Amino acid sequence: MSLISALQTTDVESVQTSPEQITERKAVRVSTLQESLHSSEMHRAAPETPRSISNSVHKLKTIYSTYQQSGQPLSKEAIFRAKQKYGILNTPANYKTLGLGDSKSESVDLAARLASKRTKVSPDDCVETAIEQKARGEAFKVTFSKIPLTPPEDVPITVNLGLKGRRDFLTRLAAQKALAFSPSLDNSMKGTSDSSSVKKKRFSGAPIGNEFDANLVNPQHPAGFKSLDLSKVLDGAERRAISRVNDRLYPQKVNFKNGLQSSDQSGVSKANKEVFKKGTLEKLEHSAEQFLESHAGNERQRLSDQQYMCAKGAADAVKDLDPKTLEDPDFAAREAQKKLYIKQVASPVVLNEAQKLANRKLQDIDSRDTYMLLFGNQAYNKLAVNIALQHYSVKQEEKKKIYLGGGLWMTPEEVNAVAKKLISPVVNEIDERASRQRDVDKDIERRSRVLDQEYEDGNSMERAKEQNDGQLLLAMASKQQQEKEAKKAEEGQRYDQFVQKMNIKLQQKEKELENARENRENLRNELQERLSKNLSGENDELNDWNDACERDLKNSSIEHYYAVRSHFDNLGNSERGYDELLEERSKIQVEIERLVASIAEHKTAIHGFGETADAGGAIPAVQKQKIPTRKDLLDATVNDPLVISAEMAKEEAEMATEECMLKELQVDEMIIIRNIMLRECEKKLEEEKETAKRSRRGTEESKNNSNFSRDVIMSTPDNNEKVTPIGKSASPKDVVKSRFLSTYNTGKDIDSSASARSITGVSGVLDDGPKTPTSNKENELIDDEVKSYKVHQAVDGTGEDSIANKRDKSSRPAANSGGSITIEQFLFNKNADKQGLSKTESVTMKREPVVDQMDSKKGHDFTHCNDNGRRSFSGFSQGSIENDYSNEVTDDQDDQEGSEIRVRDSNDSNTSPKESFFKEVI
């Protein structure tokens, strides 16, 4: 009974191989009775009103599409494809290939066998048809046992054969005893031989694989049969019973991920996993497409025809062949011996003894461990079935749910939700790809329309140009001749007038030089007299100046407080601008690379058109023969060069356009590089501001010290000035006098621009060393490198000092460019009398606009950086050179200024943005 139940259970398990029934496997494993009960209950839980196929198909067509995006339930096709994609359904990837290794040889073999079957065989001939040597050898291996049967007296009793060996030995021993003591063996042998011969004659025309050919055995091998080995069956039944009991008593949790069982429990085979790896299916499809492309339909038909002809030839060759010539002469004798031995082994006595021995052994096993075995323990089985029925009756509320095993139930809505989550990435990906493809198609259509229109416009323009050129050539020739003669006469008159004018200017300049020398001597004498009169009031003015310095220090501390608040904002803005410039530069570099590649392609196309045009567009003789009429030949020979020239002109125009775009991008890249340098300088400026603010805090703390003297405040000049502190050690009168005399008594002639020398508004002293003039080229280089950095450094004095140490001493700080003060204004206080202010107040008032000028210039630089993307480089035809001569003094300006000659500073805030822009570009 236990053996039968075990076989039934294994049969039930072997049937359930479909991955769709994986979730119900544990429920079926309980037992045959429990399986029937569960199946009946599940049938009762099925819906009472089944849908017809036509209705479901109609609803799918009308309501649901293949892929849904609006949250509606998915269609059956979508669910099927999702299951197939994730390996839930059975696919051909789960099985090995069923094709033949060598199609030609197999077809020849098959043809030979069929031909031999068609041959006529005599009815008395009991010889079997030919069997291959390999098949014969395999039949012998299966028939004969590896361990020969020995009599019991030859086997020592002390040898431990083990469970399996002992069972084999006892089975063979029972068979020997049954054969030795059975009197009716001969009659049974005769009956079986007669029946076998009848069967052989009856099924002689059947195929080879439908009969068992080994009916006789060799008498030299008395133990040639394979013993009935039930050890594996029993071991497997025990393991399955124990596992089922453990599963009932201690159920394990099944891991699920997105509604599918994970790892090995999901039913996905290793072969399926290998096939569904990333890129495997694409490789298989690609190889299949290559094979189909390489073997066209006619070639594949030709291959099948060749195989058919080969098989037909082989069949014709063996059609009249006698089967006896292919078999072994001793084959009939061996077959008779084999059949005799099989009849002896298959006798009822042997089978009964073997069955009794097997039942006795199974009863011993069942009686030994009854509490662990499921089979043979009817009480245990009934109790398990009753408990299962009680649990099932309690959970009647799960009637409309799907049982997944292990106590897990799911509603159809949850299953649909899981399937929807699994298929939504596929749906989104398909929709995204479709939308991208539609956008690309629209863009291609739009571009094609634009290109066609441009091509038509270009053709019309070329036609109009050719017509106008013919009319303008004659008129332009005569007009150029007349203009040449008029220009020649006009240039002669202008040259004479220019010579006369320059002579007059030279005389005027000589007179002005004499007057300037006389004025210089008079001014020197007058200044010496006035200095002697004004030195008495210098001490009072110096005290007032010290008070003004203290006020300036307080004002600077207030400015420092507000600057600290805006420091971090400026630093963040500078870093963001720096990152934006880097990103814009990378984009421009990518566009430059694309344009270079496109220009190379255009050059290649132009070269190909040139070679075609140089070849003369000659038509080969073979192609001429294919042209039907003379008119078509004329069109081919005349229109083709025109088309080639038009295509070549089109490629040249596109290449010229892209070269212009490349030049513009290169200019924009240079501008962005300069702006990146500006951003880096701004970062350094903010860092130096922080250090300057820390040092200034120390200065404010030391302001209340009683020993703090005026020398500390007054010894902070610009970097280009050499200052002696004004204090108790030297009188102000001696200091001012010595500095004035050292400035104007240096010997030799001093040009008229000496009156424009400026003094600082902080230190209150004159410049000690004269400045060395620099060339225009050197000034431009210094402006290009330092201007953008110095403009932002003008807000902070400490940052200005650090930059001035690194740059050339010829570049003035931005504070001095705010407005120069002549010596007459400083000594005679002309502007102060007009405005009603003291000297110290005028000095402090002049320092305030510097920050405003620098801030305005900084904002202008930011707008200039933002306009770089919209500028177009078209040479110097947009008025960019007009500012190059802005520093020269014209005749009208010379007359208006008189004796005052002021040189325009490169850092002056009045310089135009165009001038600074083109200086950076060049």
Curated annotation (Swiss-Prot):
GO biological process: eisosome assembly
Residue ranges of the region described as Disordered: 1-27, 34-53, 687-730, 751-778, 791-821, 834-922
Biased composition (Acidic residues): 889-898
Annotated Polar residues bias: 1-21, 751-761
Gene Ontology CC annotations of this record: peroxisome
Biased composition (Low complexity): 871-880
Pfam families assigned to the protein according to its UniProt record, in alphabetical order: Eisosome1
Biased composition (Basic and acidic residues): 687-703, 844-870
Induction: Expression is regulated by the AZF1 transcription factor.
Alphabetical list of InterPro entries matching this protein: Eisosome1
Family: Belongs to the EIS1 family.
Name this polypeptide is given: Uncharacterized protein YKL050C
Organism: Saccharomyces cerevisiae (strain ATCC 204508 / S288c)
Origin organism lineage: Eukaryota, Fungi, Dikarya, Ascomycota, Saccharomycotina
